[in-house]
């Protein structure tokens, strides 16, 4: 995936930008992942609910802005995922080689289980939807209800596809704006767009 480095307008801050499908008209400034699973015939998506005053009960994927050090888009996603889970899935410790090992495990978890890639043009955001393997367990007690790095109050939840759509269609919309769009809706409500439920 090609990229360029730009300087943010009015500042000296450099930002890296990737391009979706090598198209310079489809810049990516941030990226994230939505994990899905099926249990007892019902489909679920893993989301974090932010409970800060300015974003009450807003549901989001796991992701964030591209760093200058990111060589590929999955570098961004795996780093943000690790930070937002407080490294509660694969533990990060101070030894550099262990940290890299944890990051590589997250990269592999994402890359080996991709279901769909979505480019959100309005938000300049790239979303990976990945099916979580049955042997991967999210320990919510270990992950906690507070993101340590950015000091954000949040909780982690598996919610059903139906609940996702209910939150999306609510007033106000409780899904993070970077996830708004028809491609996301088509994925979570395929039957309403002429697709089978397995698509």
Show which residues each predicted segment covers:
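N-terminal strand-loop-strand
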Residues: 2-61, 74, 90-91
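Short, P/G- and charge-enriched loop/turn segments at secondary-structure junctions
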Residues: 15-24, 113-117, 143-146
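Universal eukaryotic N-terminal targeting presequences
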Residues: 1-2, 198
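Nudix hydrolase/Nudix homology domain
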Residues: 54-58, 112, 121-199
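Extracellular/periplasmic catalytic domains that process cell-envelope and extracellular macromolecules
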Residues: 26-27, 39-40, 119-122, 149
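The catalytic Nudix box helix
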Residues: 61-114
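Active-site donor-binding loop signature of nucleotide-sugar glycosyltransferases
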Residues: 50, 63-64, 161-163
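Extracellular structured ligand-interaction cores
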Residues: 28-32, 63, 125-127, 153
């Amino acid at each position: 995936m090609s990229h360029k480095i730009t300087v943010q307008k009015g500042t000296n801050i450099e930002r890296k930008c990737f391009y979706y499908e090598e198209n310079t008209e489809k810049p990516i400034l941030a990226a994230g992942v939505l994990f899905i699973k099926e249990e007892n015939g019902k489909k679920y998506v893993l989301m974090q609910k932010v409970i800060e005053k300015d974003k009450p009960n807003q549901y989001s994927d796991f992701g964030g802005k591209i760093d200058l050090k990111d060589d590929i888009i999955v570098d961004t996603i795996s780093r943000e995922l690790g930070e937002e889970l407080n490294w509660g899935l694969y533990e990060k410790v101070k030894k550099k080689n262990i940290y890299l090992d944890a990051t590589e495990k997250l990269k592999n978890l994402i890359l080996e289980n991709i279901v769909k890639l979505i480019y959100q043009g309005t938000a300049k955001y790239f979303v990976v939807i990945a099916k979580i393997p049955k042997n991967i367990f999210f320990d919510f007690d270990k992950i906690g209800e507070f993101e340590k790095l950015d000091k954000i109050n949040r909780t982690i939840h598996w919610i059903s596809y139906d609940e996702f759509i209910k939150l999306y269609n609510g007033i106000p919309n409780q899904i993070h704006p970077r996830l708004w769009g028809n491609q996301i809706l088509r994925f979570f409500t395929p039957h309403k767009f002429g697709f089978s439920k397995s698509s």
